[in-house]
Every structure is written in C-alpha cells, then in structure tokens.
Amino acid sequence: MNIRIELNFSKYAHVYDKNATLQNVMAGELSSFLPQNMPKKILEIGCGTGAFTKYLLDKPVQKIFLNDISEKMIECMKLKMPLPPYSQIIVGNAELLNFQMVDMITANAVFQWFKDPKDSLRRLKSYIRPNGILVFSTFGPSSLTELRGIAGINSPAALFSDNEWHNFIEEAGLTLNTSKKN
C-alpha cells in the first residue's frame, strides 16, 4: 500500500459505505468462515468503516486490534458503531507496521492493495501465534470486470488468481484449510 491509496481512502471515507456494496457482501460471506470458538486476541487489517468489524464485535473476544491505513476511515467507523473498551486502533500501513502476537488475523477486501502480497502474508504470519488463524477475502482477476471495462480502466490493485493466492499462502508457511471462489 502506498500514500496514494491512503489519500484516496481518506478523501472518500465519508461516502465509502454508499459505494461499498461488494465489500459489504464479502464481509458477510467472510464472517461465515469465523471459527465457532473465537480466538481471544484478534487483529483486523484494513478495518475501514467497519463492514467486517461489526461481525467481529458480535463475538466473544478479549482483545481486538483494528488497523487501517486511513484515520478518516476509522473516524467514520467510530461514528457508526461504539467500540468496546477491549478494542485498540492502530493507524498505518499494515505492510510496514509491527503488531503484537495474536491468535487470529482477519482482512476483508484488503490484500489486493498490498505492494507485495506474498511478503505481506509472510510478515503477518510472524504475528500469528502457533495454531492461529488467518481469515481473509480478496478480489480476483475477474472482480468488477464489467465495471472496469465500461469505465475503460485497469485496476489499481493487484488482482491475483486463486492459484496464485494458494501459492502465496503456501510460500508464507501457512496452511490453506478452506477456499471459496465466487
């Protein structure tokens, strides 16, 4: 991720929810992959305005770290939902930050913005305790093809195939338990 991405998300934070229909659908789908017995300590990468955060806050956890590159996105989230005392905000680029050890890392529609997803997965793995979990969703190469075609634009994000993501996961030393393609 870079400063341009942060600036764009910050600039449009106040209207993000009106335009994030797909991200909200993805958040609902991703919530179905959360474990029955929720881990105690969770890190959400790219919490944004809280589309997936709301699902995490419905679960019994002891500590949740909410990260986003845009402080304005987090401000919008705080206006929508009260954050519990066991939550902690971490503003900054997840590719560059150091995090505490956690039991689970989540990310909804975020990893496509990483400059180097493979390296980022490796780094994030180092913050997951043994037997911990990484639960994430991302866009693929066919995501929004009609819209991109009509607008005549290429995606500013890295849109990798399922096979590429599977390879990144394996190369990072993670084990893929479940994968779903829409």
Which residues fall in each region the model found?
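Conserved catalytic/acceptor-binding region of the Class I
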Residues: 133-182
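Conserved class I S-adenosyl-L-methionine
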Residues: 1-37, 51-55, 73
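A short acidic, Gly/Pro-enriched loop at the edge of an enzyme's catalytic core
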Residues: 95-105
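A short glycine-rich, Lys/Arg-flanked "PGG" loop and its adjoining helix->strand segment in the class I
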Residues: 118-133
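A short SAM/SAH-binding and catalytic strip from SAM-dependent methyltransferases
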Residues: 104-116
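Local beta-strand N-terminus motif with an aromatic residue
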Residues: 39, 86, 102-103
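Class I SAM-dependent methyltransferase SAM/SAH-binding core
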Residues: 43-97
